[in-house]
Every structure is written in structure tokens, then in C-alpha cells.
Amino acid sequence: MATKSLSETALVAVIGDEDVVTGFLLAGVGQKDKKKNENFLVVDSKTSQAKIETAFKSFTTRNDIAIIMITQKVADEIRYLIDEYHQVIPTILEIPSKDHPYDPKKDSVMLKVKKMTGSD
């Protein structure tokens, strides 16, 4: 597996509903690079799957992002992309949202860990 080098400052990217993204932005996570690319995407009922896919693909190829936080509800919409993603950096972390609790049985990272450790 090829390793990816990070730029000097590694960012956290966030994909989720307005409440989750706003919380991370208030904590100082939000950034815009020189090309005006943001490291977050607010997803609502009008956000197309294509827009979510584009943001995810963009975040996974950027050298300045080390972690992608994505609400599990949104992750379910692009589950096939997350399941196909095998790089260590950026790491994908599925998180709960206000209205949708976290289910470890759906989390790709948790499933990979269980498979590697042989636990159920």
C-alpha cells in the first residue's frame, strides 16, 4: 500500500448535516485554501449524491487533509465509495449526528478491524 505524505499542516475535513459541521467550524476546523477549496460540506435534503461523492473524492486526494469526519447517515449514501477506500491517510471516521445514532455494524473501519482481529 502506498503511503501518502502530508503537507506541513494536516487538516480535518467534515461532511455532515448543518449542526455537525457548524459544531466543527466553531471548534476551528474550517479552512479555505488559496484556490477557495473548503474542507467541509454541509449536507441537507437538497444535496445531491454526486456533490457528496465529489467532496469525498476531493478530500481523499488532498495532501493537506489527515482525517475526514463524516456522519454515518451521509456515509450510508456513499457507502460504496467508503468501502472501496483503503488508504490510511486521510483516515475516514464515521460519527453520529443529532438525529441519527452511530451504528458500529455499518462502520467500514470497525468492520475492517473486526476482520483483521478475527473478533465478532
Swiss-Prot record:
Pfam families: ATP-synt_F. InterPro entries: ATPase_V1-cplx_f_g_su, ATPase_V1-cplx_fsu_euk, ATPase_V1_fsu_sf. The keyword Magnesium does not apply. GO terms for cellular component: contractile vacuolar membrane; membrane; proton-transporting V-type ATPase, V1 domain. Disulfide bonds: none annotated. GO terms for molecular function: proton-transporting ATPase activity, rotational mechanism. SUPFAM superfamilies: AtpF-like. Keywords: Hydrogen ion transport, Ion transport, Transport. V-ATPase is a heteromultimeric enzyme composed of a peripheral catalytic V1 complex (components A to H) attached to an integral membrane V0 proton pore complex (components: a, c, c', c'' and d). Belongs to the V-ATPase F subunit family. Subunit of the peripheral V1 complex of vacuolar ATPase essential for assembly or catalytic function. V-ATPase is responsible for acidifying a variety of intracellular compartments in eukaryotic cells. This is V-type proton ATPase subunit F. It comes from Dictyostelium discoideum (Social amoeba).
